[in-house]
């Protein structure tokens, strides 16, 4: 790979396998597996912190693998990103939407960013006082990690499951394997580890979305 910097072309040789990222993947899956397996002896505040951390960490790892890491083989990378530890977010939808955002001329346009919270002054001005107050709260740090996180999950499911119910074949082709993956995750969590679904959602899924919202708060 050739990279141009300050008028000079620097040749960069990318390794066939980026072993630090492979090692990080093992840490993430191992940590998640350990927390779920021994959840009964872990105080719930620590379980919530650790569960949210490892699932959010996997979401960050998904961002790396969709950009071609840690190997040169897409199928291997996708296999690392695919496991639906969040339950609600299909990796292939995240991959499709994120790469679509990177492949157009609107990369830095806040209105086109799939993670944007931006409203034009004209649109904001048409809102009533209550709506403006709510949006100001949502754009605070606390608002992002609480209501913003929950709203994001609910809105995502509303839109994409609605497409499935209307027979959108592209969505169905993504959600079918995703639901199989969810079944495997829950077979481990509920069947092997004997953790209730509600505990997994409260201690892993929701906290991970809140942690992931911190990045979007800093960027948007």
Where on the chain are the PLM-derived regions?
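Acidic (Asp/Glu-rich) catalytic motifs at the cytosolic membrane interface
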Residues: 55-74, 94-107, 215, 219-220
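Single-residue recognition of alpha-helix capping/boundary positions
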Residues: 75-76, 131
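Non-catalytic, topology-defining segments of multipass membrane proteins
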Residues: 1-54, 84-202
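Residue-level micro-sites within transmembrane alpha helices that shape
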Residues: 17-20, 62-63, 77, 177, ...
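Select transmembrane alpha-helical segments in multipass membrane proteins
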Residues: 76-83
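Extended hydrophobic/aromatic segments used for targeting, binding, or gating
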Residues: 203-219
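Residue-level signal for transmembrane alpha-helical positions in Major Facilitator Superfamily
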Residues: 27, 54-61, 76, 206, ...
């Amino acid at each position: 790979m050739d990279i141009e910097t300050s008028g000079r072309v620097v040749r960069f040789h990318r390794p066939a396998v980026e072993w630090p990222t492979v090692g990080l993947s093992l840490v993430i899956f191992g940590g998640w597996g350990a927390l779920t397996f021994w959840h009964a002896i872990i105080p719930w505040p620590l379980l919530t912190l650790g569960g949210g951390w490892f699932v959010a960490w996997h979401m960050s790892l998904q961002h790396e693998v969709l950009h071609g890491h840690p190997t040169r083989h897409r199928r291997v990378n996708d296999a690392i990103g695919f496991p639906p530890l969040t339950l609600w977010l299909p990796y292939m939808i995240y991959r499709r939407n994120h790469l679509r955002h990177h492949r157009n001329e609107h990369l830095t346009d806040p209105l086109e960013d799939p993670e944007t919270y931006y409203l034009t002054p004209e649109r904001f001005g048409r809102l009533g006082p209550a709506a403006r107050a709510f949006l100001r709260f949502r754009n605070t740090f606390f608002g992002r990690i609480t209501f913003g996180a929950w709203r994001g999950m609910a809105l995502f499911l509303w839109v994409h499951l609605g497409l499935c119910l209307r027979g959108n074949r592209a969505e169905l082709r993504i959600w079918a394997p995703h639901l199989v993956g969810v079944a495997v995750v829950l077979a481990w969590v509920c069947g092997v580890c004997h953790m209730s679904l509600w505990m997994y959602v409260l201690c892993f899924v929701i906290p991970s979305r809140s942690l992931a919202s911190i990045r979007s708060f800093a960027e948007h």
